[in-house]
Amino acid sequence: MPDPAKSAPAPKKGSKKAVTKAQKKDGKKRKRSRKESYSVYVYKVLKQVHPDTGISSKAMGIMNSFVNDIFERIAGEASRLAHYNKRSTITSREIQTAVRLLLPGELAKHAVSEGTKAVTKYTSSK
């Protein structure tokens, strides 16, 4: 007689398929909490720059971590600048100055020009 523990196939190691709804004791279905990430936006930019290139989930995790880190650094520096100047609002000027302080040389120049372009596009669309 076969052992019941060995007859059922073992789940694959590292399989990470999330169940969309978990079953509660009283029979009601509960939605799983959503994990926010920048993966959709990173993927869109990747396809603009290199249409034929893909990205692994590990690399996407690193990119997501990088974007979160840069966001926190810029937000923190902009907050400090607003506080130093006795302002209660973070404007595009604080963000721009924070970017200039945090990013080195040519990278800061490109970031500022892209940011200015994005703000101009946003204000013209309103």
Swiss-Prot record:
The modification N6-succinyllysine is found at K35, K117, K121. Its main location: nucleus. The modification N6-acetyllysine is found at K6, K12, K13, K16, K17, K21, K24, K86. The modification Dimethylated arginine is found at R80. There is a cross-link at K35, K121 (Glycyl lysine isopeptide (Lys-Gly) (interchain with G-Cter in ubiquitin)). The modification Omega-N-methylarginine is found at R87, R93. The modification Phosphothreonine is found at T116. Transmembrane segments: none annotated. The modification N6,N6-dimethyllysine is found at K58. One of its GO terms (molecular function) is structural constituent of chromatin. The modification N6-(beta-hydroxybutyryl)lysine is found at K6, K12, K17, K21, K35, K86, K117, K121. Belongs to the histone H2B family. This is Histone H2B type 1-H. The lineage of its organism: Eukaryota, Metazoa, Chordata, Craniata, Vertebrata.
